[in-house]
Amino acid sequence: NTPDYDQLQAEEKTVFPTDRPIREIALELSGDMRRYIWGINGRTISQEEKILIRRGDIVRFRLTNGTMMLHPMHLHGHYFRVVNQHGDYSPLKHTVNVSPMQTVTIEFLADEEKDWFFHCHLLYHMLTGMARAISYEGSEPDPDMVAIQKLHLRDMRDNQWFFWGRADVG
């Protein structure tokens, strides 16, 4: 069973300041059971650029799961609102389950800096590419994130059908 986020309600308001710009980003969780390669918007982390965001913006991800598997999506360094029927009292989370063929909307205040990791918490899905680097504009690249992308690209090049990988994620 997956949680019904419409049943969750925060005790206090979780809304962000209304004077901030809102950046909406559509992310389709993709992959299949034949090749067992997972991605976002049909691409793995090594094939895709970082998602650039601006400090101070409200970032809204619309996560659509186009697969037949559950994907618990986790964002490092930020709590996000799971936008639901409770509006101002939508719950705060750092991981959200996106059920098969469903869409969940999350939003967070971009109040950090540098690079942060957004990925499926099913580690094999993460290792095969269902992840993105979220990067604040003007930040220097995080060497650990660059290393993960290079490792994944090398593994995919060496064996296009299946691979064992490793990623250190803090």
PLM regions with names:
Residues N1-G170:
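Copper-binding active sites and cupredoxin-like electron-transfer domains
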